[in-house]
Design a protein with these regions (language model features):
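Generic structural signal for beta-strand residues in well-ordered domains
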Residues: 4, 47-48, 136, 252, ...
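A mid-sequence, solvent-exposed acidic-amphipathic segment
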Residues: 236-270, 274
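Iron-sulfur cluster-binding cysteine motifs and their immediate structural context
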Residues: 261, 267, 271-292, 296, ...
């Protein structure tokens, strides 16, 4: 089971490759968090099949896990499939029969060989403890994370593990952190600051090529459930960028209030409203787009990058800047 969030498509590409490699379900987080969509709900638990991996794939926002993804992980419920419960029940029944046979054999042996009751009891207790420890060790799902970023990720994985460790549903499955984590350097898409723009075409192509090679290795390791891998580009002073700069991003820069449309360029096609992952835009079908100013906007710039006429602006920060989405 792979949970992913994607704006401009970098992460969806990576998540899709992982789904193909592991033959596991791909689940988009965005529909469960949209204010305008009641067809998805977090009230019902997600069912984790027998031996299924649990993956989280998302872009890095401000050297952190995106706020929407953190909220989703904090609220989600995960349970094992009923077949697992049935198997455990059958295993318990089999164990009971085995224990009964074992008890009879020991009783017969005790009668014929005059074994002490104390020795027999200890042998059975040790066997039961060994079986319990073995079952417990094999019950935890393999949990991993792949995050995409234009550059470094800071303490994003530490940020993720903190959220995971506080989810009671995941705790019940023995999950308190990811077992392996990876970052992929992908083409830039954040254009909300004066010094930030999309990559030149040559660099975009190079990043995609390198990431495709790295993702192939990641897919193999995740398929094999390889634990203890931490292949991350944290960058310099990771705590500063996640704690200080990341806090500034969330508190000041994540807002839809600076978005506007140049009406002489806009054709009212509605593409921006359709691609917004959180449903924060209404428009199209003959109407200019309007940002709804609800709290879920991530300033992911998906609307900006998908506008076919480059009519969407973010204050004065996007003047003469490029557009990018994964193709």
């Amino acid at each position: 089971m792979i949970f992913y969030f994607s704006g401009t498509g970098n992460t969806k590409w990576a998540a899709s490759k992982l789904a193909s490699a592991t033959h596991e379900d791909l689940i988009s987080i965005a529909p469960y968090m949209r204010a305008d969509d009641s067809s998805h709900t977090l009230a019902e638990p997600f069912i984790l099949k027998e031996n299924e991996r649990l993956g989280f794939v998302f872009p890095v926002h401000g050297w952190r896990v995106p706020k929407l993804v953190r909220e989703f992980i904090g609220k989600m419920k995960v349970q094992r499939a009923e077949s697992d419960a049935a198997e455990n029940s059958a295993s318990a029944g089999s164990k009971a029969l085995s224990d009964a046979a074992e008890s009879k054999a020991l009783s017969d042996a005790a009668e014929s060989k005059a074994l002490s009751d104390a020795a027999e009891s200890k042998a059975l207790s040790d066997a039961a403890e060994s079986k319990a420890l073995s079952a417990s060790a094999g019950s935890r799902p393999f949990v991993y994370c792949v995050c995409t970023a234009g550059d470094s990720i800071g303490l994003t994985i530490e940020n993720l593990n903190e959220v995971i460790s506080q989810n009671p549903s995941l705790q019940a499955l023995g999950i308190t952190e990811v077992k392996s984590s990876y970052s992929l350097i992908m083409p830039e898409s954040y254009v909300g600051l004066p010094f930030m723009d999309v990559d030149p075409k040559e660099k975009e192509i190079w990043k995609k090529s390198k990431s495709a090679q790295k993702l192939a290795v990641i897919c193999e390791e995740i398929f094999d459930r390889k634990e203890g891998v931490s292949r991350l580009v944290k960058g310099p002073i990771p705590w500063f960028f996640t704690k200080v700069v990341g806090g500034f991003f969330e508190n000041v820069l994540i807002t839809d209030k600076r978005f506007h449309v140049e009406k002489d360029k806009c054709v009212k096609c509605g593409i921006c409203a359709n691609v917004c992952p959180v449903g924060d835009i209404k428009g199209g079908h003959g109407e200019y787009p309007e940002w709804l100013h609800h709290k879920d906007c991530l300033t992911c710039f998906t609307c900006y990058h998908h506008c076919p006429h480059h009519a969407i602006k973010f204050g004065n920060q996007t003047q003469k800047k490029g557009q990018y989405y994964f193709k």
